[in-house]
Amino acid sequence: MWRAGSMSAELGVGCALRAVNERVQQAVALRPRDLPAIQPRLVAVSKTKPADMVIEAYGHGQRTFGENYVQELLEKASNPKILSLGPEIKWHFIGHLQKQNVNKLMAVPNLFVLETVDSVKLAGKVNSSWQKKGSPERLKVMVQINTSGEESKHGLPPSETIAIVEHINAKCPNLEFVGLMTIGSFGHDLSQGPNPDFQLLLSLREELCKKLNIPADQVELSMGMSVDFQHAIEVGSTNVRIGSMIFGERDYSKKPAPDKCAADVKAPLEVAQEH
């Protein structure tokens, strides 16, 4: 049986990247013409992988990378070799962010997008912390939506989407809202039709743009991982998060301690549902 990580293991990072990018373009060609013409961004998720693999992918043209844990991201982004050999690198944080880890995340070199804002309080904390950093640029943020309604997943209920975006735009001058993010239902059978989670995120963007008078091409959709990224792109994703197909299977015995406290019961999902 084909496995997501086998491509990288057999071909190496460079060949795996080329193969993934080819599949991205194949999916783009199948998108409906009425969708915003945004070239999908490939976020190479390097969690549990060494800095040398990030540098190798960078050497093959990859510039955007993602991490799930604040400590691991801070260590990699601060790595002298990555800083020296990857000056154009852009980091996306794609994991659950607890408020006590916000200041640490804001210290990450070359932090480009925070994809997982899931509350007004978190948005306020990030806004204040980024202001204290004194960056001349606003921090790009996405709002994470729990489109499936599963208790094991983080994210806002769909009904709260417009309210939090209004809050960010009106009350968080140091943040730039750039899109919506979701994790699709694991194991969705495409023979039954498109993933309803992806369709819901599309409809939320349409509603958001209509009510707040925002052009659709200014609201990205981050959805799709190694197992479903082509389908996600076909229905409108502009940002896919892919790890094992590029870097190979993960060894969780070497994974840094996750950014969680005893009360954070949702973190194990990341092991079951792979990027």
Swiss-Prot record:
SUPFAM superfamilies: PLP-binding barrel. Gene3D superfamilies: Alanine racemase. The modification N6-succinyllysine is found at residue 125. It holds the Pfam family Ala_racemase_N. GO terms for molecular function: pyridoxal phosphate binding. The modification N6-(pyridoxal phosphate)lysine is found at residue 47. The modification Phosphotyrosine is found at residue 69. InterPro entries: Ala_racemase_N, PLP-binding_barrel, PyrdxlP_homeostasis. Keywords: Phosphoprotein, Pyridoxal phosphate. CDD domains: PLPDE_III_YBL036c_euk. Belongs to the pyridoxal phosphate-binding protein YggS/PROSC family. Pyridoxal 5'-phosphate (PLP)-binding protein, which may be involved in intracellular homeostatic regulation of pyridoxal 5'-phosphate (PLP), the active form of vitamin B6. This is Pyridoxal phosphate homeostasis protein. It comes from Pongo abelii.
